[in-house]
Design a protein with these regions (language model features):
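Nucleotide and nucleotide-moiety/phosphate-recognizing core
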Residues: 2-9, 13-94, 103-105, 148, ...
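Short, glycine/charged-enriched secondary-structure capping and boundary segments
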Residues: 21-23, 52-53, 108-110, 114-116, ...
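Generic structural signal for secondary-structure transition and capping sites
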Residues: 32, 80-84, 134, 152-155, ...
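A short, local hydrophobic-aromatic micro-motif
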Residues: 34-39, 127, 280, 304-306
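Conserved hydrophobic "DFG−1" position in protein kinase catalytic cores
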Residues: 62, 101-102, 171, 321
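Conserved histidine-centered catalytic loops in small-molecule metabolism enzymes
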Residues: 103-167, 239, 295-322
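Enzymes that bind and transform nitrogen-containing heteroaromatic metabolites
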Residues: 165-322
């Protein structure tokens, strides 16, 4: 039997955003757990013990099979794997995963109390919970009503990506999986170029240095935010340059703070490999023939082919993470 649960997430040590996204990815990988909805991440002041760094907080709705206590053990194992050490009540932590509420379930024992005993007292819990489940009834009031009664001072939406898999991948590969040769494209297929433009227009595109250098006149792609992931490149006109993945997350959080945008990794091979763990969907154009490539698309392990359409000169495929 499947149950619906609401999980609170928090962190105030280390790379808080990536730790929370990693926790969400690990939750999604647990047997019997499905992530259904995730709130924005929020900057929040510490609660209880105020002599500690500020927190990031969020809420997630999941479905799960099994007992509440088994779910608790799964969440605690994720906390442990991510370095959670329980030294101080209400103290600083790398990650905190709390079961806030399970629909249709109440329980109270030494291990677990549901609904969470402090649920309606904590604005840092209520704000993200009300975002994803405003009509959820808790002790006679909705989450939105409890939120309106709370002191939400100091709680603001964070410039952080909250999705565990926030990226999409788009590539064109020949029959051998090749994607490039001598720093450039294998071939120019107008049909694929139109597909690429249609998918990415208005979004954010992330590329490696060699891909940037292969663009016509090294100019950014029009109508898109262009980001180069490179530890060697100091700067390039019209491009945002980030030296590593943590810096990329910071920039993407800022670029998507006011409105969500599609985010694509567009190559080359090193960029694909670095960002594939964070991709939820891949668009792959299959080009007929083999063109002597020297760079190749990484295997899409953990993805399933969900759509295949034959074009005039190529085949368009969509893969989704499973």
């Amino acid at each position: 039997m499947k149950h619906t649960a609401y999980i609170g997430l928090g962190a105030n040590l280390g790379d808080r955003g990536e730790c929370m996204r990693t926790a969400l990815r690990r939750m999604a990988a647990c047997v019997g757990i499905s992530l259904e909805r995730i709130s924005s991440f929020y900057e929040t002041p510490p609660w209880g013990n105020i002599d500690q760094p500020p927190f990031l907080n969020a809420a997630a709705r999941i479905s799960f099979c099994g007992t509440p206590h088994h779910l608790l053990k799964q969440l605690q194992s994720i906390e442990y794997a991510l370095g959670r050490v329980r030294r101080e009540h209400w103290g600083a932590r790398t990650i905190d995963l709390d079961i806030l509420h399970i629909e249709g379930v109440t329980t109270e024992d030494d291990m677990l109390t549901l609904p969470h005993p402090y649920l309606t007292q904590r604005a840092f819990v209520l704000v993200p919970l009300a975002e994803i489940a405003p009509a959820l009834v808790l002790h006679g009031k909705t989450a939105a009503e409890w939120c309106s009664l709370s002191d939400c001072a100091g709680i603001v939406r964070a410039a952080e990506l909250s999705g565990p898999y926030p990226l999409e991948l788009i590539a064109a590969a020949d029959e051998a999986g090749g994607i490039g040769r001598a720093g450039g494209l294998l071939m120019h297929c107008k049909e694929d170029m139109a597909h690429f433009r249609r998918q990415t227009m208005g979004g954010i595109v992330i590329m490696g240095r060699r891909t940037m250098e292969s663009l016509p006149d090294k100019r950014p792609l029009a109508g898109r935010e262009n980001i180069v992931l490179s530890s060697r490149l100091q700067g390039a006109s019209g491009f945002c340059v980030v030296p590593n993945v943590p810096a990329l997350w910071n920039l993407l959080g800022q670029l998507t703070l006011d409105a969500s945008r599609r985010i694509f990794t567009i190559g080359g091979a090193e960029c694909y490999r670095a960002l594939l763990p964070y991709v939820h969907q891949a668009y792959v154009t299959r080009l007929p023939g083999i063109y002597g490539a020297d760079t190749f698309l990484p295997p899409l392990k953990g993805f399933a082919l969900t759509e295949r359409r034959t074009g005039e000169h190529c085949i368009f495929e969509i893969y989704k993470r499973i």
